[in-house]
Amino acid sequence: MEAALADGEPDRSSLLGDSKDVLGPSTVVANSDEPQHLTPGKMSQRQGRDANPTPTRDLPQPSLSPASLHSQGFERGKEDISQNKDDSSLSMSKSKSESKLYNGSEKDSSTSSKLTKKESLKVQKKNYREEKKRATKELLSTITDPSVIVMADWLKIRGTLKSWTKLWCVLKPGVLLIYKTQKNGQWVGTVLLNACEIIERPSKKDGFCFKLFHPLEQSIWAVKGPKGEAVGSITQPLPSSYLIIRATSESDGRCWMDALELALKCSSLLKRTMVREGKEHDLSISSDSTHVTLYGLLRANNLHSGDNFQLNDSEIERQHFKDQDLYSDKSDKENDPEHDESDNEVLGKSEESDTDTSERQDDSYIDPEPVEPLKETTYMEQSHEELGEAGEASQTETVSEENKSLIWTLLKQVRPGMDLSRVVLPTFILEPRSFLDKLSDYYYHADFLSEAALEENPYFRLKKVVKWYLSGFYKKPKGLKKPYNPILGETFRCLWIHPRTNSKTFYIAEQVSHHPPISAFYVSNRKDGFCLSGSILAKSKFYGNSLSAILEGEARLTFLNRGEDYVMTMPYAHCKGILYGTMTLELGGTVNITCQKTGYSAILEFKLKPFLGSSDYVNQISGKLKLGKEVLATLEGHWDSEVFINDKKTDNSEIFWNPTPDIKQWRLIRHTVKFEEQDDFESEKLWQRVTKAINAKDQTEATQEKYVLEEAQRQAARDRKTKTQEWVCKLFELDPLTGEWHYKFSDTRPWDPLNDMIQFEKDGVIQTKVKHRTPMVSVPKMKHKPTRQQKKVVKGYSSPEPDIQDSSGSEAQSVKPSTRRKKGIDLGDIQSSIESIKQTQEEIKRNIMALRNHLLSSTPATDYFLQQKDYFVIFLLILLQVIINFIFK
């Protein structure tokens, strides 16, 4: 035991010796050529660990006081702490007698014991200053390092004169750098996020507005720039204690709020402790690397919480951030022994609880409540799937004589150009599934989107998005078929499991309107970093021998980690040969896929077969990939088979997409909700009798069952009209300002691998199981009261609806926590929005009238002046001519 104490307890004087110490037999000497980077964030834990030498590299450490050394249990473990405290005097005498094993000197124990506390404190201050300089250097290198960027984009900032200026904003951990240009050459200012709060701000202008402010109305600006600039570029004056910022779109604004919420918590780049879950990220492996990755910066935000998280402010004390009083200069300047002892007691407590680092767990990952079993919907693998053949064979159908009579009966009810949405179609042309189900055909290759989310090059991201878009068309039924028109309130749920990333892509759809027929859908895979939402208005036009099914609306694909939105449209379906010829179904129209943030876009043209064209002209497609107006590549081929891409720069042509049998084999497997757990208005259960009759080829029974469903829908509509009730959707809501349908429980936060555990779905609500519950930063597009699904969300899950807290004094309007919107549309908000629009229109009208009156009043005077001038010039010319004639006469 005495030997263990001698080998394991470095005396305070031993730490004053040379850096090349002579260690005991149980210690391995570190390579002196390897630079050992020691950060202030790791000083406290290394002081505890190095008091007990283990077979690891030995670093020169700052000296410890006797109180911290005595509180350490050395090699004996936590169970001997009390005994070690009783024998503290004995261990100190033995360690001092053998201190020459550590400092390599020939001084005896009496000489080493004469070291005064003043000398020890001097060494501590020296080490403190060195670590402080190193931390400051690392912070400055992070600010100037172009690779360490959380987010960067153009934002509009309101000045003190209430005018907006477009500036380039670069978000880094703990700071927001503002430049005049994108080249980061003209620095405007640096916002210190450590003392800032962020809140959404209502605004009449377009885009998304939020406010960054100091709660105590103090300055949020740094004194100097990232390169030591004392004066920033000349712009309009900006407020000192707050910034009002406006993004171009709501999705960009929400992404900025999420990123700022993370960045303002990252007041220290360096962490004092390292949790077990973070060891695989090489935080302690490469000690000679000072490069800080974006992933490490973001994960530092969630590593610690509560009282055990003490910020390392050594690198930002000079700029006067929040006063943490943790190893501050003021406390170091005082030579009060009681103050030193209090510091050492804190260190001792941390050492006592963290003796064995491998067994330590961070408090952030300790759930105070018992882990509850995950309550999620049961999904079953889809047993049967129909894939039609490529080409024209699977898109044509010969109508029997019996069905022709039904078609002629139908044609008597319609006229050319008529909308067929209210016409009851015969069941023999129905595909035995709902239109909500058919919209899910685009996600059997959702793994392409997972790859696109990881792609760094925006051009390659666009190519993968286009490839995914084309992958949704080759799955088609055999023959000419049309899916069921969904019943109002009908829903459909399914998911796909990604084997490579061990994630799930969830698909939720609901029929939100019957007249006009609108289907809303939402797709989410937060772990892989993408979500997609949209709504489709189905229209159909009759042209005599043909009809077209037009899908109006757009889908919005969002990459969560990048804040990019790809807006895309849909082609229309064209059926010809109704009266004569072979009935054929084709796709036609122009599709646009546009990313406003990057400037990249794609144009795809689905071509109809010409009247005299061969089978090679069936299902043709052509397209362009563009950056602005510049065409980067062209596409040619068939949307259900090979598509070739031709690069304009290299003029090389290669296969871009081809649904070969191998591709179809590796497509993701769809899982649908277990039939017993489905709601009565879910597609499979709602249409089960009609589907059963169609599969049995009993058209009479199918027509009867279809009529029962449609009549029940009409009766429900009449009842609501009698009671003056409005239909309230279950999962989606309408934005009265934009007219878009949004999923009520959307969660567009980037995936946090340290806090987010698994994404799951229950009762149509897509949620995330988390290790540590934190309030969500993102705010829903419309506030509403918690629905039945929200009340079922248990603590420990990521709730799609955030808690809205009161704002303190900096805003004139405070948001009450209980302010939630009822189901459906709040008439009060709609009325206020309409009044705001009316006021804006009146103001515009007044401005137009004033401008017109000004023009009318100024035009005659101008014309009169011009006429007088012309007359005067003519008179002078005539007079000059007369004088000349008189002289030469």
Swiss-Prot record:
GO cellular component, one term: endoplasmic reticulum membrane
PANTHER family assigned to the protein according to its UniProt record, in alphabetical order: OXYSTEROL-BINDING PROTEIN-RELATED (PTHR10972), OXYSTEROL-BINDING PROTEIN-RELATED PROTEIN 8 (PTHR10972:SF216)
Pfam families to which the protein is assigned, alphabetical: Oxysterol_BP, PH
Its membrane topology: Single-pass membrane protein
TM regions (residue ranges): 871-888
Region (Disordered): 1-129, 321-374, 772-823
Residue ranges with Basic residues bias: 781-794
Family under the similarity heading: Belongs to the OSBP family.
Mutant lacking the gene: phenotype: Mice are apparently healthy and show no developmental defects nor gross abnormality of glucose or lipid metabolism. However, they display a significant elevation of plasma HDL cholesterol and phospholipid levels. They also show a modest increase of APOA1, plus a number of mild gender- or diet-specific lipid metabolism phenotypes. Deletion in bone marrow-derived cells, including macrophages, reduces atherosclerotic lesion progression.
Bias-annotated ranges (Polar residues): 62-71, 805-817
GO terms (BP aspect): fat cell differentiation; negative regulation of cell migration; phospholipid transport; positive regulation of D-glucose import; positive regulation of insulin receptor signaling pathway; positive regulation of phosphatidylinositol 3-kinase/protein kinase B signal transduction; protein localization to nuclear pore; triglyceride homeostasis
Protein name: Oxysterol-binding protein-related protein 8
N-acetylmethionine carried by residues: M1
SUBUNIT field: Interacts with SPAG5. Interacts with NUP62.
Described function: Lipid transporter involved in lipid countertransport between the endoplasmic reticulum and the plasma membrane: specifically exchanges phosphatidylserine with phosphatidylinositol 4-phosphate (PI4P), delivering phosphatidylserine to the plasma membrane in exchange for PI4P, which is degraded by the SAC1/SACM1L phosphatase in the endoplasmic reticulum. Binds phosphatidylserine and PI4P in a mutually exclusive manner. Binds oxysterol, 25-hydroxycholesterol and cholesterol.
